[in-house]
Amino acid sequence: MKLPLLNEIDIGSMRAKMADAPAFPHFCIDNFLEEAFANEVHDAFPSYAEAEKTGRVFSTVNEKRKVQITDSSKFPPAILKLHELLASEEFVNAMSEMTGIPNLMADPALAGGGIHETNSGGHLDVHIDFNYNPNTGLHRRLNILVYFNKDWPEEYGGYLDLWDKEVKECQGRFAPVFNRAAGFATSEVSWHGVTPITCPPDKMRRSFAVYYYTKEAPAGWNGKTHSTVFKARPTEYWKGVVAMPAENLMRATQKSIDSAKQSVKKLLKK
């Protein structure tokens, strides 16, 4: 496959590698974009301070020091061009062929995707993603992450790590280096996370995330929908038994409060 702004991808070879991948089907493509375009996108990323003004800031036990911008009207021109490329019919059809997932669809709203920037000290705990978007009625099937981090040595962390279904053993890890695309089929066993980021304060981990959906449910789906589900790594015992349950309780309590407020508002309108 060869599309404008994108380096050639051997679809057949990548499909075979995905089928043989440990843990769950995944892939890694270096030199994903044409170099000039990759540099253009790299230079277009906002600073962390700028991103905070327009995006959603995460500061929780599970996800910390991360900003996410999903509104494409706020994308700089080069990043908007990347969004359009990854949502194009030609690219989406090629991803269906490569992954073996028929009838993939892009998400124009980029729910949970778009520009991701994580500051030094940030992290993302191991999780499986929400499996269904109630706003569109579509099933989430594929994640693709494109990284834009130059001069990123191993000690900076921020690796994408992939885990077995019990979250006992890491089955693969990818450095978030410049112009690398990593992707995987999302499922009930596609446990993944981002290792702690330890880069200098003047740097940040930058990526662009896109997620793809189908109208049809995946084979073997049990009919249950869920939001993001987190698990502690084997080395994070206290987080798993104390911090995560405490935060889950706080979220559940807040959800109940919000629901009660909505009920009161409806009653007052009658």
Give, region by region, the residue ranges found by the protein language model:
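Active-site rim elements
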Residues: F27, S72, P77-L85, D129, ...
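Non-heme Fe(II) oxygenase catalytic core, chiefly the N-lobe of the double-stranded beta-helix
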Residues: D43-P46, K74, H83-R140, N149
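Non-heme Fe(II)/2-oxoglutarate
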Residues: L5-L6, R15-M98
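A structural signal for well-ordered alpha-helical scaffolds and beta->alpha junctions
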Residues: N7, E34, A38, F75, ...
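Eukaryotic charged/polar low-complexity linker/IDR segments
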Residues: N143-L145
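Catalytic core of Fe(II)/2-oxoglutarate
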Residues: G121, Y132-R140, K150-K270
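A structural signal for the main folded, soluble domain(s) of proteins
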Residues: V57-S72, E97-M105, A111, H116, ...
